[in-house]
């Protein structure tokens, strides 16, 4: 199902709602309520056209500017998400049941690609922790593995060996349970477009974009760190943690500066993509250059 622009809240309407919400939240600043869902200074989101027409989605192509067209025939419904592994209550949900069970929140997050570009995206979704708690992880659940859909008949990039398919990613359990870690179901107040990972993707704003898999069908809680698709393809370049770190360059891209899509000038990249206050304590005592 291709989400037409007319099916997404028009940007002027969406931005008007955000201004009203911001004014309302501002009146509560004295009692400590956050003025943004991310807990950081408010960024202005990129436009819908920028967000939906410049995408890294190797399941379709390595050309970012054609993904939206190639994804038009992708069918995100019906859809089932399964949670299994080291949990006391494994289960599966239809996407419609997930949307009913978990209250949807609007959050504006920064997205930083390891290639040196960035965006600001207004996601809709719910905390991954809410889903995992319902399945009751046991004491052996140390990591969380995410598996994306495999449909080479629709996702023509999967017909090539660009990456090991299906796309697989992982987080530590404490990263997965962090309040910022979002299962995104929407964009600009409406359902996700296929090219942005419909119907369900991860959004982990303090990590590089490849740590946020799209079109997730399976979540598995495991004892050991899962081997991700990028680690299998180029483990010396793509580590398990992938925290945004301006002090640790990628072999092909410096990470000190970034270009926000729609802007000409580069800007300094912030540690943990600007979310250090919320997440740096997760990595206390770790060598972040070694654990990249």
Regions found by a protein language model. Name each.
Residues 6, 17-19, 203, 220:
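Small/flexible residues
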């Amino acid at each position: 199902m291709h989400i037409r622009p007319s099916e997404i809240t028009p940007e002027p309407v969406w931005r008007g709602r955000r201004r009203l919400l911001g004014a309302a939240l501002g009146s509560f600043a004295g009692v400590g309520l956050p003025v943004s869902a991310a807990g950081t200074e408010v960024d202005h989101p990129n436009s819908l056209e920028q967000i939906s027409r410049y995408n890294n989605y190797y399941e379709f192509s390595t050309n970012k500017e054609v993904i939206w067209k190639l994804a038009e025939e992708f069918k995100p419904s019906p859809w089932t998400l399964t949670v299994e592994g080291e949990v006391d209550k494994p289960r599966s949900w239809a996407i419609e049941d997930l949307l009913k069970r978990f209250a949807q929140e609007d959050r504006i997050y920064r997205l930083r690609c390891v290639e040196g570009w960035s965006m600001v995206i207004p996601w809709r979704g719910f905390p991954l922790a809410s889903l995992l708690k319902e399945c009751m992880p046991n004491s052996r659940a140390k990591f969380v593995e995410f598996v994306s859909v495999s449909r080479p008949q629709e996702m023509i990039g999967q017909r090539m060996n660009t990456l090991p398919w299906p796309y697989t990613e992982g987080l530590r359990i404490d990263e997965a349970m962090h309040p910022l870690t979002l299962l995104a179901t929407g964009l600009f107040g409406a359902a996700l477009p296929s090219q942005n990972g419909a119907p369900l993707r991860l959004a982990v704003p303090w990590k590089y974009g490849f740590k946020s898999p799209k079109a997730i069908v399976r979540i598995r809680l495991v004892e050991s760190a899962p081997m991700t698709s990028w680690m299998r393809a180029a483990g010396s370049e793509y580590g398990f943690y992938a925290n945004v770190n301006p002090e640790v360059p990628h072999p092909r891209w410096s990470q000190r500066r970034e270009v926000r899509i729609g802007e000409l000038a580069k800007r300094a990249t912030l540690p943990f993509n600007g979310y250090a206050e919320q997440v740096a304590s997760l990595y206390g005592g770790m060598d972040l250059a070694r654990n990249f």
